[in-house]
């Protein structure tokens, strides 16, 4: 029987909320948390918290990849970012957290992958799409940029 997998974080003020959580569903409406509702993966690098994750399966290798925004409000909102979303947008991480698995159970150690440049602010909300015509993957994300004085976000 097939199931849907929901890869998500929880909006909580404690560090365990900004980690990778899994839930499964048979119908896409009724969900059951896995791992007793505790994080399946923990972020130990960068901001030590992750949000906005996406999962993709590599067509060639069959491996699963999770990419996530490197951001922890529970650890950094007060001290690192002075309670300011603008400061996060300007000074947040330009890396994405990344994990790899063959079976959705056993995962690699977290890897930080640099996507942003020095002209960008925080790299947010990644997603991955497969271009079947060219057999390539495209990772895109949102970020503020120096070219518009770090105003509106753009998608890269």
Tell me what each language-model feature is:
Residues 1-123, 129-156:
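Beta-rich carbohydrate-recognition and catalytic domains
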């Amino acid at each position: 029987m097939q199931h849907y997998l929901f890869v998500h974080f929880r909006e909580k003020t404690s560090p365990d909320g900004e980690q990778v959580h899994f839930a499964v569903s048979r119908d896409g409406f009724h969900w059951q948390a896995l791992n007793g509702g505790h994080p399946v993966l923990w972020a130990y690098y960068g901001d030590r918290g992750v949000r906005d994750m996406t999962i993709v399966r590599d067509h060639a290798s069959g491996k699963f990849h999770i990419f996530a925004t490197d951001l922890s409000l529970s650890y950094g909102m007060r001290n690192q970012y002075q309670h300011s979303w603008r400061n996060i947008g300007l000074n947040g991480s330009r890396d994405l957290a990344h994990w790899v698995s063959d079976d959705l159970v056993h995962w690699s150690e977290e890897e930080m992958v640099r996507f942003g440049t020095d002209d960008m602010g925080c790299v947010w909300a990644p997603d991955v799409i497969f271009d079947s015509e060219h057999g390539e993957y495209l990772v895109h994300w949102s970020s503020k940029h120096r070219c518009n004085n770090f105003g509106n976000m753009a998608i890269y």
